Curated annotation (Swiss-Prot):
Protein's job: Might play a role in adipocyte differentiation and triglyceride accumulation.
UniProt keyword Aminoacyl-tRNA synthetase present: no
Lineage: superkingdom: Eukaryota
Induction of synthesis: Up-regulated by USF1. Up-regulated by FOXO1.
Protein name as it appears in the record: NEDD4-binding protein 2-like 1
This protein's UniProt keywords: Developmental protein
Subunit structure: Interacts with dynactin subunit proteins, including DCTN4, DCTN5 and DCTN5.
Length: 173
């Protein structure tokens, strides 16, 4: 599953994508070979990055690649019934608690993978989800730093960053 997840990064693009070519059927197992065991490990992905860095785009790509995946975003709290987004900072704490309850319920129900699509800029935003991993049957926690994954050329003229050395986990896009 981890390899497929990493492949999702490679398919991210701002351009319209062509459908992938069909995969050839798997060859039948050799006689006497035990059947391949499927991984039943549960996964929680914490997407982390500034607004506009591509977290929601990646979350949707992952959900496309893994149809059983559920996305939980605190932003959903601020959508009105008519579909309009209306952020109110006075309700931010309540919105985070609401999202955590939804994620906890999904974990307890054995849903996997679970994708947390929040900015998660502060440790207090991520900590409840990390704690849930140890309180439930989730086995793997992945924190993805979006500022190292998504390059958006149209945003380049509005951004500035200091010169820095490449870090071992950084992916140049």
């Amino acid at each position: 599953m981890e390899e497929s997840f990493l492949e999702s990064f490679g398919r991210l693009s701002l351009r319209q994508q062509q459908p992938p070519p069909p995969r050839p059927p798997a060859p039948p197992p050799l006689r006497g070979t035990p059947p391949r065991r499927h991984s039943f490990r549960k996964h929680l992905y914490l997407l982390r990055g500034l607004p506009g860095s591509g977290k929601t785009t990646l979350a949707r790509q992952l959900q496309h690649d893994f149809p059983r995946a559920l996305i939980f975003s605190t932003d959903d709290f601020f959508f009105r019934e008519d579909g309009a987004y209306e952020f109110n900072p006075d309700f931010l704490e309540e919105a985070h608690e609401w999202n955590q309850k939804r994620a906890r319920k999904a974990m307890r129900n054995g849903i996997s993978p679970i994708i947390i699509d929040n900015t998660n800029l502060h440790a207090w935003e991520m900590k409840p989800y990390a704690v849930m991993v140890f309180q439930t049957e989730q086995k793997n926690l992945f924190r993805l730093e979006m500022d190292m994954v998504v390059f958006r050329p149209e945003m380049k003229k509005h951004s500035w960053s200091p010169k820095r050395e490449n870090t071992p986990n950084e992916r140049t896009v």
